[in-house]
């Protein structure tokens, strides 16, 4: 059993001070737009990932007119409980602790409180560039393999250093070969590690996505999913040598695992070029539910599932199937937001499990 049982928000987004007690595993949160439904889910996400689900600085989560925020949560894990606290100080310093013991490195927290979120803007995972899909893969893999997260952090640091080196060298038309060689070796070591882990993981994960898509989609689609990486056919060292003059000219590293993507095709055509809105929704939910299943299998318990405004994305039948899947087939704690109390209540009553409604 893994669940968030209590959440206290102080000066977080639109909340001055609010405490929530979660007595059930199925929790519906209703209220008008702007009432704080998404912010509540984001607070739970913060406690799981040490950061917001939105790509924004921590300071933007501080309530207007306040200097910092505090998020405190109590999580049930099997028969015990753990207290997690995130504080943003007035000076912009963030502190994170578990059971009153502060983390020296926030990365040590990732994976201890697994979580999957489905939100309105997630369609960018399908429609936007490769960065969105890499972020999805990295967020999932980092919850599964801590050494992967450490190597990823290291890779991004070395990549930034190499890009700074290229800018300096390009502007002066001169560079230190020994420093370049050190950066190259570090980038290759970490990049090869990341590539091997992604390849091994995606060979298992992508078939799971495909199975989820088949069960969700009501049409007979020929969907193909493939890991797309420059390192699949050419060694990283060779790529760096081939691209050095171009990298120097552009002042950035143009090859490596930071360019990886998922090649998604529908009937042999790039998915985002031909897929309907319904097919895009189906693939989005397939990827998220595959992540949910992967975490559940790896951790031995299901992750917390945060569903933000999904009633607006799915028709009644698909919504019922989704709730039935996550609420009846697993013991997962599920948070669902909606503007309509009646719609939440009716949906929960149909699946026949105890639920809690919270109005904002």
Task: Briefly describe each language-model feature range.
Residues 37:
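Conserved lysine of the Walker
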Residues 45:
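Helix-to-loop junction immediately C-terminal to a conserved catalytic motif
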Residues 73, 333-340:
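Structural recognition of the conserved hydrophobic beta-strand(s) that form the central parallel beta-sheet
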Residues 107-115, 119-185, 189:
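A conserved P-loop NTPase coupling/switch region
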Residues 48-132, 141-144, 148, 206, ...:
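Nucleotide-state sensing region of NTPase/ATPase domains
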Residues 1-32, 174-304, 313, 317-333, ...:
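Conserved NTPase motor "head" modules and their coupling/switch loops across ABC/AAA+ ATPases, GTPases
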Residues 308-310:
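Walker B catalytic acidic pair
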